[in-house]
Amino acid sequence: MAWFKRESGELDTSGKKTVRTEGLWVKCESCRQIIWKKDLEENLNVCPKCGKHFRIDARTRLALLLDENQYETLDGNLSSTDPLKFVDLKPYSSRLRQAQHDTGLKDAVINAQGKLLGRPVVASVMEYAFIGGSMGAVVGEMITRAVERALDSKTPLIVVSASGGARMMEGVVSLMQLAKISAALARLDKAKVPYISVLTDPTTGGVTASFAMLGDLNIAEPGALIGFAGPRVIEQTIRQKLPAGFQRSEFLLDHGMLDAVVPRKELKPYIARALDFMAA
């Protein structure tokens, strides 16, 4: 038996070295500059040229927010069903399977319990890549469980939102989650357990209309789209041009809808200081 085999095909005798560059560069949608992907990732997925905050997945977000090797994920066994047998361009059940395959998650949120700069916290982080981060029965149940876990342990709660709103494929079951989570947060508030809401790009629809805006402290990342209906829908409805920057986090801060706009690099220490202040 031969130990070595010559690969089939002709040898490249041109003397030219082929270097693959596909996927190594990213174009910033804001400043239109070309960025080396490694530089972008090392800068926490924030454009080093203009400061635009790129969207990041829930696992990356969780790793940035909580201390390394100091947290565990929870409730990851819950999975949505298809109560209405909903079909649009394709069956909802197929959309679920595809989203689960693409993200490696059961649904659009990750629950965790751990430490943030040494401070114990309970966290829920939404995954926009899972059907637009939409909120169905499982998302509602998981966030409610996080609230109740924070309540039982008297541990501060952090929810990071990234969502297009209620999941239409689950109908009224999805809409019920707004009230369910809000009621749980009311119990948390009554017990005087801190709740910090972090709104990222985008946070819209029923998520904005419920738990995302109910924090003791509502923080947003720079440039995040935050609102109920999207700006295009509003313009078509009122037949007027909206102001520049409308529904962006800086606009909302200027008009009293947010407590702070905090860059991604500063978010973790900012929350830590806020928790210390609330505990004082």
Located regions from the model:
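Conserved catalytic cores of soluble enzyme domains
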Residues: 161-279
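Cleft-lining beta-strand/loop regions that shape enzyme active-site pockets
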Residues: 110-189, 196
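Cys/His-rich microdomains that often coordinate metals
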Residues: 34-35, 53-54
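Residues immediately within or flanking Cys/His clusters that coordinate Zn2+
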Residues: 25, 44
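Short, small/acidic-rich helices and loops at N termini and domain boundaries
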Residues: 45-49, 55-56
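Short cysteine-rich clusters marking metal-coordination/redox-active sites
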Residues: 28-31, 47-50
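An N-cap/entry alpha-helix motif that binds or orients negatively charged groups
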Residues: 8-18, 26-27, 54-111
